[in-house]
């Protein structure tokens, strides 16, 4: 007589966690950090069409790492939820904490009930409405639905330890935009285990801000000459080689 294969709940959760962590580890890193005028997002992303950073609502931004199709579905769902809430009640009733909780509940349900967890990690950020002085809010949501608020910065992706170490050494409150971009880009290029730091140029970076000084929609992308002016000096040939080596597939990790 044969017996059905049994796996304990603890082992099932461990295997799901391992699967999700491996998927996230293959993605290039993203930084979200608070600066003097709001929140800065800097992602290592050579693709111009598959974006890791986007706007969710008037004062709320979104960043993610992992499988693009999965976090893009979550991004789209968050936008629809925010639009519905803002239409039914008031635009000011839509908050970053509210959206972070929705994402946490969704990912927690997927992790425990579906056959495969989402291989994603998310950040939801919010800045104060124009004229208010509330500090920026940063929320990290992991693949299993865990949620944490971070006071200064969030680092996500495959190589987070050297990036977090670099930011802990260089980050200060109320940085200017230029200084914030500089330390974020240098942190993204930090070497692992003593390796030489990498030089990242405009071709390999996706940069955006939530600017609390903007009257309604705070989200703004920084591209082209505006981005080049904020970056440390880079060698153009190195930047080009970095972009060619980092070409990504649309269905894979981002």
Curated annotation (Swiss-Prot):
Quaternary structure and partners: The 20S proteasome core is composed of 14 alpha and 14 beta subunits that assemble into four stacked heptameric rings, resulting in a barrel-shaped structure. The two inner rings, each composed of seven catalytic beta subunits, are sandwiched by two outer rings, each composed of seven alpha subunits. The catalytic chamber with the active sites is on the inside of the barrel. Has a gated structure, the ends of the cylinder being occluded by the N-termini of the alpha-subunits. Is capped by the proteasome-associated ATPase, ARC.
Function per UniProt: Component of the proteasome core, a large protease complex with broad specificity involved in protein degradation.
Statement: the UniProt record of this protein carries the keyword NAD: no
Organism, as annotated: Mycolicibacterium vanbaalenii (strain DSM 7251 / JCM 13017 / BCRC 16820 / KCTC 9966 / NRRL B-24157 / PYR-1)
The protein's name: Proteasome subunit alpha
Associated pathway: Protein degradation; proteasomal Pup-dependent pathway
Activity regulation comment: The formation of the proteasomal ATPase ARC-20S proteasome complex, likely via the docking of the C-termini of ARC into the intersubunit pockets in the alpha-rings, may trigger opening of the gate for substrate entry. Interconversion between the open-gate and close-gate conformations leads to a dynamic regulation of the 20S proteasome proteolysis activity.
Domain of life of the source: Bacteria
HAMAP family in the record: Proteasome_A_B (MF_00289_B)
Compartments, as annotated in UniProt: Cytoplasm
Lineage per the UniProt record: Bacteria, Bacillati, Actinomycetota, Actinomycetes, Mycobacteriales
């Amino acid at each position: 007589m044969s017996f059905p294969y049994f796996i304990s709940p603890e082992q099932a959760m461990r295997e799901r966690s391992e699967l999700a962590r491996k998927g996230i580890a293959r993605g290039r890193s993203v930084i979200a950090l608070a600066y003097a005028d709001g929140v800065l997002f800097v992602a290592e992303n050579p693709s111009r069409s598959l974006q890791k950073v986007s706007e969710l609502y008037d004062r709320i931004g979104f960043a993610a790492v992992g499988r693009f199709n999965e976090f893009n579905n979550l991004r789209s769902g968050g936008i629809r939820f925010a639009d519905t809430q803002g239409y039914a009640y008031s635009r000011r009733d839509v908050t970053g904490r509210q959206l972070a909780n929705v994402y946490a509940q969704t990912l927690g349900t997927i992790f425990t009930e579906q056959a495969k967890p989402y291989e994603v990690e998310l950040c939801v950020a919010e800045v104060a409405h124009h004229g208010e002085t509330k500090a920026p809010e940063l929320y990290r949501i992991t693949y299993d639905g865990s949620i944490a608020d971070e006071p200064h910065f969030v680092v996500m992706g495959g190589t987070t330890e050297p990036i977090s170490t670099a930011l802990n050494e260089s980050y200060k409150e109320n940085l200017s935009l230029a200084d914030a971009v500089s330390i974020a880009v240098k942190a993204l290029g930090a070497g692992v285990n003593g390796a030489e730091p990498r030089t990242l140029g405009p071709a390999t970076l996706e940069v955006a801000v939530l600017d609390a000084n903007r009257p309604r929609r705070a989200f703004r992308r920084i591209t082209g000459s505006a981005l080049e002016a904020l970056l440390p000096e880079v060698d153009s040939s190195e930047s080009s080689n970095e972009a060619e080596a980092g070409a990504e597939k649309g269905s894979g990790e981002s």
